[in-house]
């Protein structure tokens, strides 16, 4: 199971929020490769779960090594749950949640956390929105009280909403509109999902953000911000009984104000055509090639998902990964190469591959070598050594993840918010151990195919402004492209 990553981060399951979450990805460091796989949990035998009378789910992850707690509230709503024409409202509401209630004026919550020596954050994904604080354990009742208050007590007026909308528009201009790589990533996301709401950016389309208003924010808030649509995760120096008592005294007093329904979204049809995009811009310092494939999430198909986890590690696992070893070390065509897979999603998700050519290498030559490497892997699969190294690396990440209570809280929160369970998280390492070389080869053969792919070229150019346009697939035997 994967923790939230950002996209998100190029997996832009894209976390976007007031602050960027600290744990976006695990970098492969020395290889210059970003393997977009977040840490997993190997064992968490002490995890406790219970549900309050108002329907709020609670997860407690005891960790007594330091007198500190991480307190998170996850709402089962993200950008993919937005009404058509109102993209960005989930992220916009995340901003507005810091604007105050009748009981606590704007900024007071953040000021109190800061005075207590704590940290806070919030982030929005396609499938969830989360808020968290990290404080000394004696301050847990304080942050629980504040968070419970703003669950239903937020005060929104035009004087609050409209200026914050301008803040979001400026955020979009800075992060996306002024960044060629982000523009291309956004276009690729839209090209990948032709029917599913994962197609629109988490921050929203500019023209639709401009039209968001107080009524939109209130309607979204009243529909989705209710205890029976929320998950409380507390990790740290606490006991389950203590958390239950505090949760009942704070969140337990919040009445549910909407009935939750199954999250049924338009699903992506089986893709039938390769899609290719190119963006040329004078601000591009390093050309790059990126390719994403439509694949199942863990919730959609556990067996395939775990095999895809192993595949991403075999292909993109640092300096020993197949792509880095082939394209960078052996052929000398790339300065970097990697792979990632975002398994934590409610619906079908993406598997990604990226590479950057050396200065004297054309991006077309690099792509041909990448195609050959993927085709060879789909034909022959991983070696026994590659498979063992990949599985060992994934399990090691799972063990290391237990050293960070914030990581544990994120992993459990993201899993539960996307339709999986705490048992799924705990069972994931044993599922990895059981993956065979044939399973890894099989998912590569079935999913790393042209019809399921969106390929992008980010190029250097003197042309301004940036322009993105579709590129026709290579007419010379596109069926050989993998």
List where the protein language model places each region.
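N-terminal secretory signal peptides that target proteins for export/translocation
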Residues: 1-20
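Non-catalytic, conformational "gating/processing" segments within enzyme and secreted inhibitor domains
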Residues: 165, 218-250, 452-453
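Bacterial N-terminal signal peptides
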Residues: 21-35
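A common structural junction motif
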Residues: 148-156, 250-258, 371-382
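Short, polar/flexible loop-turn hinges at active-site or ligand-entry regions and domain interfaces
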Residues: 99-104, 151-159, 175, 379-383
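Non-catalytic beta-strand/loop surface segments
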Residues: 2, 38-79, 105-139, 175-229, ...
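Short pre-active-site segment immediately N-terminal to the catalytic Zn-binding motif
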Residues: 78-86
């Amino acid at each position: 199971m994967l923790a939230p990553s950002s996209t998100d981060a190029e997996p832009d399951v894209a976390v976007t929020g007031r602050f960027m979450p600290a744990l976006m990805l695990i970098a492969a460091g020395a290889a210059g490769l970003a393997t977009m796989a977040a840490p997993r949990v190997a064992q968490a035998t002490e995890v406790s779960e219970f549900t309050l009378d108002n329907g709020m789910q609670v997860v407690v992850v005891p960790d007594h090594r330091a007198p500190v707690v991480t307190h998170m509230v996850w709402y089962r709503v993200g950008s993919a749950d937005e009404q058509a024409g109102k993209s960005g409202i989930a992220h916009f509401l995340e901003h507005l949640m810091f604007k105050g209630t009748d009981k606590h004026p704007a900024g007071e919550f953040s000021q109190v956390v800061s005075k207590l020596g704590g940290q806070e954050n919030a982030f929005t994904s396609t499938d969830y929105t989360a808020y968290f604080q990290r404080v000394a354990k004696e301050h847990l009742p304080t942050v629980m009280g504040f968070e419970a208050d703003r669950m239903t007590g937020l005060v929104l007026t035009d004087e609050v909403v409209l200026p914050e909308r301008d803040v979001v528009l400026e955020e979009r201009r800075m992060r996306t509109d002024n960044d060629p790589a982000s523009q291309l990533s956004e276009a690729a996301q839209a090209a990948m999902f032709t029917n599913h709401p994962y197609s629109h950016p988490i921050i929203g389309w500019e023209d639709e953000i401009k039209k968001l208003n107080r009524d939109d924010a209130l309607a979204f808030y009243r529909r989705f911000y209710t205890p029976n649509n929320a998950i409380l995760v507390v990790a740290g120096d606490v006991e389950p009984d203590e958390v239950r008592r505090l949760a009942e005294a704070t969140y337990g007093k919040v009445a549910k104000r909407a009935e939750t329904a199954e999250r049924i979204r338009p699903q992506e049809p089986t893709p039938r055509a390769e899609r290719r995009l190119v963006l040329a811009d004078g601000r591009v310092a390093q050309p790059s090639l990126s390719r994403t494939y439509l694949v199942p999430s863990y919730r959609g198909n556990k067996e395939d998902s775990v095999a895809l986890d192993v595949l991403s590690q075999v292909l993109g696992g640092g300096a020993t990964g197949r792509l880095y070893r082939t394209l960078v070390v052996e052929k000398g065509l790339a300065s970097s190469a990697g792979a990632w897979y975002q398994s934590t999603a409610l619906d079908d998700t993406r598997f990604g591959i990226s590479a950057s050519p050396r200065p004297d290498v054309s991006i077309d030559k690099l792509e041909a070598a990448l195609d050959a490497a993927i085709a060879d892997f789909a034909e022959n699969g991983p070696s026994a050594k590659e498979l063992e190294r990949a599985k060992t690396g994934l399990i090691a990440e799972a063990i290391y993840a237990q050293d960070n209570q914030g990581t544990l809280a994120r992993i459990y929160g993201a899993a539960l918010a996307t339709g999986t369970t705490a048992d799924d998280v705990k069972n994931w390492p044993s599922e990895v151990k059981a993956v065979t070389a044939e399973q890894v080869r099989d998912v590569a053969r079935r999913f790393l195919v042209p019809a399921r792919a969106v390929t992008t070229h980010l190029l250097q150019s003197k042309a301004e402004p940036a322009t993105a346009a579709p590129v026709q697939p290579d007419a010379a035997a596109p069926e050989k492209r993998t």
